[in-house]
Amino acid sequence: MTGPSAPSPPSGPSEPGPVGGPAPAAANAGAPAGAGGPGGGTAVEPRTALHAPTGRSWRAFLQPLAIIAIGGLWMLYVENSDLDSIAARVLAPDYVAQKTWEHIELAVVSTLLVLVIAIPLGVLLSRSWARPATPLVLAIANIGQSAPAIGVVVLLAVTFGIGFWTAIVALVAYGVLPALRNTLVGLQQVDPTLTDAGRGIGMSAARVLARVELPLATPVILAGIRTTLVLMVGTASIASFISGGGLGDLITTGVSTQRTPVLLTGCILIALLALLIDWLGGMAARLLAPKGL
């Protein structure tokens, strides 16, 4: 025997699912903002937020704008200063641009050589059969960075002579460690279950490295490249001691002739160039990092 049943609520075409269930929200998710009742507005919020401008995107460009502003103000100050003939000749725009380009060449060429050496070496040392040699290789790389940079430059100049390529060899010896260590750390922190899954579906060891390990290690490797670039920009100033060129020539000229504006111009330009390279490296890391990491 059944009792009296409760009156059923009126049903309409606007209620495709049970009351309080996910169906109404799913039905209203595609509705435009402000339509579809009170549930529709809540469902649309995440979609609209994806296209709304954020303060973070604007802050990303504050650093290069500040670098350009500081560099422009300093050069404007130098041009309007009362300089003698020596300082005016050294701080001529053409000469400063030439030394800046030489400095960029030193940093970029040395960084490329570091990456050609460090990344393949890091990949090899991350393999199980090569791990016993890892401490020895890292110790050798540590020697290059722990030794005073000026001492390495002078030693190489005595051995191979002075010039651009001697400075490049010194910079490469000084910059291998960050890129090598980051490559090793990035590959070693890959979850072993992911590599086992790749082998389980029939991938070869080379394909697991290319399709699983390297993409997952990319953010750490890119951080090492960024560190190496900034390190090379700062250390390239020592090339002036062996006629390697670069903005270090402004510093040595300013010290030897006791011209403070020349000395400060070299220091400020090197610092601004390092900050600009750091910003470019950060932007490249965001663009090149695999999606979802």
Kindly label every feature range from the protein language model.
Residues 1-112, 289-293:
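N-terminal, non-cleaved signal-anchor transmembrane helix
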Residues 98-110, 157-178, 218, 262, ...:
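Loop-to-helix entry region at the N-terminal start of transmembrane alpha-helices
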Residues 117, 141-149, 169-184, 188, ...:
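Faces of alpha-helical transmembrane segments in polytopic inner-membrane proteins
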Residues 121-156, 181-189, 196:
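Cytoplasmic-entry segments and transmembrane alpha-helices of multi-pass inner-membrane transporters
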Residues 138, 150-181, 185, 203, ...:
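Membrane-interfacial helix termini and adjacent extracytoplasmic/periplasmic loops
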Residues 158, 235-270, 289-293:
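Glycine-rich helix-loop "coupling/hinge" segments at transmembrane-helix boundaries
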Residues 173, 205-239, 261, 265, ...:
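Transmembrane alpha-helices
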Residues 179-227, 240, 247-251, 290-291:
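Short cytoplasmic-facing helical segments at TM-TM junctions of multi-pass membrane proteins
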